[in-house]
Amino acid sequence: MTYSLTEKKRIRKDFATRSSILEVPYLLSLQKESFKEFLQKDKKPLERDPIGLHSAFSSVFPIHGVAGTADLEYVSYTMGQPEFDVKECKQRGVTYSSPLRVKMRLVLFDKDAPAGKRPVKDVKEQEVYLGDVPLMTENGTFVINGTERVIVTQLHRSPGVIFDSDKGKSHSSGKVLFNARIIPYRGSWLDFEFDHNDCVFVRIDRRRKLPVSIIFRAMGYSSEEILDTFFDHTHISYKKGAFVMQLVPSQLKGQTAAFDIADGDKVIIKAGKKITARNIKQLQEAKVDSVVVPEEYLLGKVLSSGITNEETGELVARSNEVIASDLIETMKSIKDLSFRILFIDDLENGSYISDTLNLDTTTSQLEAQIEIYRMMRPGEPPTKESSEALFNSLFFDEARYDLSSVGRMKLNRRLGRKDNEGSLVLENQDVVDVVKELLNIRNGLSTIDDIDTLGNRRIRAVGEMAENAFRVGLVRVERAVKERLNQAETDGLLPQDLINAKPVSAAIKEFFGSSQLSQFMDQVNPLSEVTHKRRVSALGPGGLTRERAGFEVRDVHPTHYGRVCPIETPEGPNIGLINTLAIYAKTNKYGFLETPYRKVIDGQVTEEVEYVSAIDEAQFVIAQASAAMDSDNKLLDELVTARHKNETILASSQDIDYMDVSPKQIVSVAASLIPFLEHDDANRALMGSNMQRQAVPTLRADKPLVGTGIEKTVAIDSGVTVIALRGGEIVSSDSARIVVRANQEEIAEGETGVDIYNLIKYQRSNQNTCINQKPIVKAGDVVSRGDVLADGPSTDLGELAIGQNMRIAFMPWNGYNFEDSILVSERVVQEDRYTTIHIEELTCLARDTKLGPEEVTSDIPNVGEAALSRLDESGIVYVGAEVKQGDILVGKVTPKGETQLTPEEKLLRAIFGEKASDVKDTSLRVSKGVEGTVIDVQVFTREGVKKDARALAIQEDELQKVRKDIDEQYKILEEDTIDRIQPMLIGQKLVDGTEITADFLASQDSSKWFGLNVADDALSSHLESLEKQLVAKKEELNGVFEEKKKKLTQGDDLQPGVSKMVKVYVAVKRRIQPGDKMAGRHGNKGVISRICPVEDMPYDETGRPVDICLNPLGVPSRMNVGQILETHLGLAAEGLGAKINAMLEQQADIKELKSFLHKIYNETQGQKVDFDSLTDAEIIELAGNLRKGVPMASPVFDGASEDEIKALLRLADLPESGQMKLYDGISGEEFDRPVTVGYMYYLKLNHLVDDKMHARSTGPYSLVTQQPLGGKAQFGGQRFGEMEVWALEAYGAAFTLQEMLTVKSDDLNGRTRMYKNIVDGNEYMEPGIPESFSVLRKEIRALGIDIELEQE
């Protein structure tokens, strides 16, 4: 295996028994691919596929004028360049988007020609601006109004047909009623349902129900056609004074004979006997094809067609009429009588449709359509045209109804049709087949569907949702255009006069800005970003609501396997509604989730990988990834555990169709980061997955000693690290930028040979954590494409590192770890292991007020020198200033209205000309509880307002940075070109005969080499072209600089009424302290109870104290044993690191070092490492990085076994039990039994006590009830609730209770009086009537009951 530059520096010992068949796919591909399809930016306008924006336009256009004299057609669209890049958009608080321009064609027809044959009179084409479309950043997010947002993928009910039942809950009898529902992508829902009398009804859009025959009549079927469609028939004729029935063998089986069936005199089947297959055979052998039936047999049978007396033309009986005794008499009198009855039995052919027809009062197509019109639009008078138009538009009009290709595929597959394609609207046959299938289910011939299977729920990603939002906007435009098209010709209008872009841009803005699925990105650490982008929500528009979702929808379903993670979902009301994609899952063209499997043929496992959706999976037999195989990949066991039809079975190895590609296939990214996940209880694993997302990036990231091997993938795919775009050599590397000279073969035509990576320094994330990048390469390193050049937040050498490795002991310590509390050593604080940086953004706006503009200035009235000492002459704080609560960051004064002056003030004014009292101090101050360093200031000034000195200085700084980048690029290009021409020139001759040598070139200025007069013409022209290239490049780079300069020097687009905006960023250092929440990766969370001096902590025989003491009682009841295994393996990892460290200290021989590494990596189970492929220097560097511990990877469901952990503990000369003697730091005595000690990866979560501590004296009150507000954000109080009142009542503390409910709460006068009394030093209170009592009185009066308070 070849290792990249960063991988060589630190190789993980991997315990996986199987090498990976399939690499983990790019984790953000779902988001990025979806949006790429929506825009189709890289395709030429006329070659675009009918998806995304193109599809939205094609479905709305062309728009036809009402009068038919003009059409507006869509031709194509183009996307412009965004005005600002992502970084500038975040700074300025604008949306990262690019303008959408659409080419429209207005076609005018000749008015005077007859309709339908109108010749084209004129065609006008024009590009129309249709608003800005937000663009996706490199990392799958959107910048909307300066903040990064994620559009969460939705899981919604797939269009198609679903058969279900009410599980016997609808009717009091408990009878199970079946129903069918045809769900389109957009349009009216069509429901069919049985009632308790076994009649079939139809509902449109969940309105009032109608008999199902009405919809067939409306589609043009007569009663007889309806009966023909749904029933089999039996022919009966009247001959020689008897009724003769034709026998149909298929109708006889299983029936009970109502009379003797005989061949001549020989009785074959006796009356009352059940007819068997043998009886039918006997009848066929005897060639009995008809039988005389007694008259009473016909009583109660139903006619399938009407009976007419041919002689008189009289209608004797209608179709669907029940045969009664008087009808039989009439029938006997008809000559040559022959008729059909419906074949109905109690087994498999119910009379449901026949019974339903009896309820139907309509007799013709028009009546049925009018009935439907009345139901859809009650109160409106129906006409023939309107009712016909409404019915056709409901299901048969492409503009109103769209089944979509998914819906058509699902419908056809469910109805057992061969073809998956077809019309995108409903057809008559579809409705008939759905009702037939519903009848089959009622007759017990078919089964209902499972609604919660992933075969009936599909994924709607960003692109599709944006397309729908866009289509909504276009439909709004369409209405306006239709009306304007009439006057298009008379007024000589152009396409842009017809189209108003506002509705479209409003729809897009609304979707990206305030849709339920457009969420503020969770950016605590790289994992939370990745997980947020891979989230799948069942909520949102067109989805479920929390209140209505039952248990079934939320539950884990067998089809989740490999598609949706069964572990990672939030606790609380959203449990099961918000899920996360499994690590290998992807969507197919229909939007259903698929998971990869290896193909298995006759027990031989192949390398071929196929993606299978939940719809197809049930029919296959699928083995686990852990099934035993020999070296030739043949399944060893005769019987293999497998999954088939959503059940786990034991199957013969010959019957296996597929096999999982990886053991971690079933879990999500976060869950696959938990080592020994297989030993944890699911509830705790859920908490572990969720808490990893809340881990705050520490000052120095520390890779986990025990990981799972997927850390690298997450760090790289999250986009927080810097990845080499092309291979090459590092020219320079410092904390702010890395410059790479690209390899010659990787430079494409017209590209520069230089890559400059500007690193992000101390930027604020959405959650106020710190985003900072640090280089991990040095000048002279040779890198390849895809190598990690710089670490981001929470990454260490290109691996995800969200916590710290802590030495942990599982033991109680003086009660300080009661109930999951955590005892932490002071050393952890001293070493800043959990110190985190949080960045607060504080904004100051200078507005134009009625009394004049506000002004940012350092001249603030009534403020001392000390308070202004940190401000520059513009009134803005210096970068680097240490500030604390209440300090001024931006000085600002606001004009205040003229007030009546006292005589003294008038005198002072007259003497000193004092105007200071005209303004009040509205400076931006440091908010409560914030103390830190100012790390950045940005000043934005409105166009036309003069920039202050500070703004100009910031602008100058920015320009210098850009200039430096551009100069560096040019310098490297120039050096490269000169390096290339030097060998060409040496040995050549000048025109005057001088030979060019290395010394000659050294004596010349290298920039003059191009102008050398060489004798060789070809070389001369080559030199000339190279010089031209350089000059052109220089001009291009200068153009880039001028563009940037223009952006920086122009005014900023601020919100209305704001003339200046100053943003100040304050970095706050938070050390760990009691009250902070910490957790491991196994759901083992707790709160720090005490920071204990190092000397008091328990220590081992070598005198090494532990860092953290955890309560051993936190393990058994929670069943998360993974943490114990992690602790043991962590101990081995650290012990091996200590041995390597000792070898390096003693400068051991490189062979000895290699052999020890070989023992660690290659003599236990897992993936082998070839140390011979590394140079000695690389081995030394690797060993140097392993001093603090050998990092291990224990992949989920394929991790280290107990024996392997023991073997590594032995190798590290540590006790195999993982337990050791500890001594009490306070008394020095040995504890009475060995204690489990080891290394666990521990995280500090974003629930810091500093953000939660809060106390109120007086503060804001609620408007209506006048009670104090609640919550820290409102500076609220603690609620004294119902139960607390009971407690005081129980104690009989009457006066305390009285003050709680009156003066401390909502007795207005009482509380002001008391406050005044306390100020006066008079501690006396007189309670009055609480305001909430008055509110109650008012509410009672609102009910019309007068209530008065009478004074006694």
Swiss-Prot record:
The UniProt entry, under Pfam families, shows:
RNA_pol_Rpb2_1, RNA_pol_Rpb2_2, RNA_pol_Rpb2_3, RNA_pol_Rpb2_45, RNA_pol_Rpb2_6, RNA_pol_Rpb2_7
Instruction: Return the EC number.
Output: 2.7.7.6
* Keywords from the named record: DNA-directed RNA polymerase, Nucleotidyltransferase, Transcription, Transferase
TM annotation in the entry: none
GO cellular component terms? DNA-directed RNA polymerase complex
List, alphabetically, the InterPro entries matched.
DNA-dir_RNA_pol_bsu_ext_1_sf, DNA-dir_RNA_pol_bsu_external_1, DNA-dir_RNA_pol_su2, DNA-dir_RNAP_su2_dom, DNA-dir_RNAP_su2_hyb_sf, RNA_pol_bsu_bac, RNA_pol_bsu_CS, RNA_pol_bsu_protrusion
Catalyses which reaction(s): RNA(n) + a ribonucleoside 5'-triphosphate = RNA(n+1) + diphosphate
Top EC class of this enzyme = transferase
The answer to whether UniProt assigns keyword Mitochondrion to this entry is no
Q: Tell me, in a sentence or two, what this protein's role is.
A: DNA-dependent RNA polymerase catalyzes the transcription of DNA into RNA using the four ribonucleoside triphosphates as substrates.
Assembly and partners are described as: The RNAP catalytic core consists of 2 alpha, 1 beta, 1 beta' and 1 omega subunit. When a sigma factor is associated with the core the holoenzyme is formed, which can initiate transcription.
Q: What is this protein called?
A: DNA-directed RNA polymerase subunit beta
Q: Which organism is it from?
A: Hydrogenovibrio crunogenus (strain DSM 25203 / XCL-2) (Thiomicrospira crunogena)
Q: What would be the name of the gene that encodes this protein?
A: rpoB
